[in-house]
Amino acid sequence: MIIHRVTKLFNLGFTDPTDSIMNMMESFNTEQKCREYLEDLLWYKDPICTNCLSERPDHYKLKKNGEFNGIYKCKDCRINFNVKIGTMFENSAIPLRKWFYAIYIFTSHKKGISSHQLARDIGVTQKTAWFMLSRIRHSLRSEKVKSFDGDTQVDETYIGGKNHKKSWQKRVENTQGRSTKTKAVVFGLLSNGKVSTEIVPNTKGKTLTTIIKNMVKRGSIVVSDGWRGYSQVHKHYEHKSIPHTRGQYVKDNYHTNSIEGFWSLLKRGILGIYHSVSPKHLQLYCDEFSFRYNTKDFDEGNRFNFALYCAFEERITYENLIA
C-alpha cells in the first residue's frame, strides 16, 4: 500500500506543509518547491533513473541558462530523466503548483469539485480542468481495494436514467426498478471500513457471485439483501441474507447499512456536484468516491500526500480518456 510508504516518509522526519489550503499554497508557490517535494516523496533521498532504475546521488544535473530545472542525466545509461516521467504530470503544460492545488481541493472536498469550478479557481479552460480531474481520478485506481476478508457487505445500486428529468419525447418506457435500459449498475463490497465498486452489466447470480469469489477471501461472512442474484453465495461462504422486501434490515446483528450509506454519499455527490455522469466515465467517479470513503479517517494533509503519491502509479492520455 502506498500509504505505508508515505507514513514511513513522515516518520523519518519529513515535514508536512499540507495541513491546510493556505499552508499548502504558501509552501508550494514556485515550480521548484513543488518539484523538490515530488522528488522527496518519490525518491526519499537520491535521484532514480526512470530508464535503468539506477539510484545514486551523483547523477548529472543539467542546467539551462545556468539554472537547474530538475532534469538529470543518468551516470550509468546516459539517458535524461526527471521526477515527472511516468506520472500524470509528464508532458503537462500545467504548472505543478496548479496541479497541487487541484489535487488538494479534489481530495479535501467531501463531494469533490466540478471542472467548471476548478477552471475558475486556477485559471484554465473547462476542458483542461476536466482532463486534470480525470487524470487524478484515474491515478487513484492504483489504490483500489482488491480483496476483502471478515464480514463483507455486498450490494448493488442503479445510477442515471431518471425519466422525470427528460422531455416527453426522450422518455423511455419500463425503466422503473431494476431495469438497465437507461441506468448503469454498480456493484459494491465493503468490509473493515473499506469499499470497492465495479460497473457490472447486470445483477444476475453468475455476475455477482463471480466478483464475490474473486475478491472475498474464503472463510469470510458475506452479508447481502434478499436479491435472488445472491442465491448461490451460500455455496462458497457463510451467507447472511437479509430480505428487505419483508421489512427486515438486521439479522443476528448483521446488516447492509454501511454499503447503503456509501451509495447515498456517491449519489449525493454525483447529483450535487457533477449533476450527471456518462456511463463511459462512471467507473472513474465511483473510484473517486471510494478513495474518499477509504481515506475518511485521514486529515487533509495525509489525504493529499496519499493522492499525490498515486500520481506515480498510473498515467492516462487525453486520447485514451476520450476513446
Model-derived features: positions:
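Residue-level recognition of single "structural anchor" positions
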Residues: 1-323
